[in-house]
Amino acid sequence: IISWDAFSFSNAMSSLIYLRDPGDKTLQERVYRELMAYCKEGIYGIGRVFTAEEAEKEEHLKGDFSFVVESDGYTSFADKAVRPLVVEFDDRDYRFGHATHGYLPDRGAQPVFAAQGPDIREGIVLERGKVVDEAPTYASLLGVTLLDTEGEPMEEFLKA
């Protein structure tokens, strides 16, 4: 590759889109329009396009990327830069299988959070939790407070 405007960094069921010049509003608008057209067309496996701002606000995901592309639930994204850009399912690379990561929290595997110990209340069940609350919970169990972090300790589990 000798010249580029944008590239995709795969996270399997989602992909981060980086721009060569994130400050170039014309480029940003062009790439956004193209991504939205791919999403609307329905054949490229894109279920949703997030701007960086939407990804941070809705999913606590932030970084130097400009967009996040979420799978339609059936498509894995790769890092190939050569044609063909759309290929049949191939499980030779574990990152692009059907049982992988990179989904939005309400899709794909739903991991279990389980805790036991002298500072954990017994019999507590939460139907849903937030990953951003796990580190503050662990810190609280250790008697420390995390500074400059998102999320809150899951007090429901903790003994007073």
Predicted regions and their residues:
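Substrate-binding rim/cap in mid-to-C-terminal beta-strand-loop elements of soluble/periplasmic
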Residues: I2-K25, F96-L141
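A generic structural signal for short, solvent-exposed coil/turn residues
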Residues: F9, L61, P105, L146-D148
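Composition- and surface-driven signal marking solvent-exposed, interaction-prone regions
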Residues: V31, V82-R83, E127-R128, E150-E152
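Non-transmembrane alpha-helical segments in soluble domains
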Residues: Y32, M36, A135-A139, E155
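Short, solvent-exposed coil/turn linker segments
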Residues: G45, F50-T51, D119, K130, ...
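Terminal low-complexity/disordered tails
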Residues: Y138, L142-L147, A160
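Cytosolic regulatory/linker segments at or just downstream of nucleotide-handling modules
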Residues: E152-L158
